[in-house]
Amino acid sequence: GAIEACGHKVLTLPEYQGKVKAEDVENYISNFYADDTYLHMVAPGMLYISFPTEYGTIYSKKELQDIHSVCKKWDIPLYIDGARLGYGLAAEGNDVSLQDIANLCDVFYIGGTKLGALFGEAVVVCNDSLLKNFFPLIKQHGALLAKGRLLGLQFECLFSNNLYERVSRHAVDMAMKIKQAFIAKGYNPVVNSNTNQQFFLLPND
């Protein structure tokens, strides 16, 4: 995909309902550097996770803290995909705040289009050392918007009067009604998701 088209390599880890475990990250990196031929292999350079995941599951604060600690130990950035961040923050049982997200990663982004914005996402860089040459890289990849202020205006609105939180909460509440309606009809969810991502297996008939 887009990552490998830019010259990087995607290295996969085991997933548990869409999530990765800190011990798997630790084992992968430690085993990599324990190999005498590691200089001839693709080095792990960043950890990419999603909150919530593609299954709608969410990481606990403890899970994020553990993953963050491993990344710090091995000096690799932690990137959190927040395309549906608002729905994760609004999920019942979530103990992670927006401030926690900022404290426990190097870069994350706040999804816009999946919460009602017309276009764009807001990238939040928490590690200033990663900003070197960031603007030239944006231009190099053809990603510099001519009227970027219009993107920013959307987030100014979303983060006024708790709109971002209200939109997220409403979507999750509606999803829970749909979830309960399916369960009442005898269908079981593929995973237990408390976000607006709900997946059920239905018979072909």
Where do the protein language model's features map onto the residues?
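Conserved PLP-enzyme active-site core in the AAT-like
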Residues: 1-205
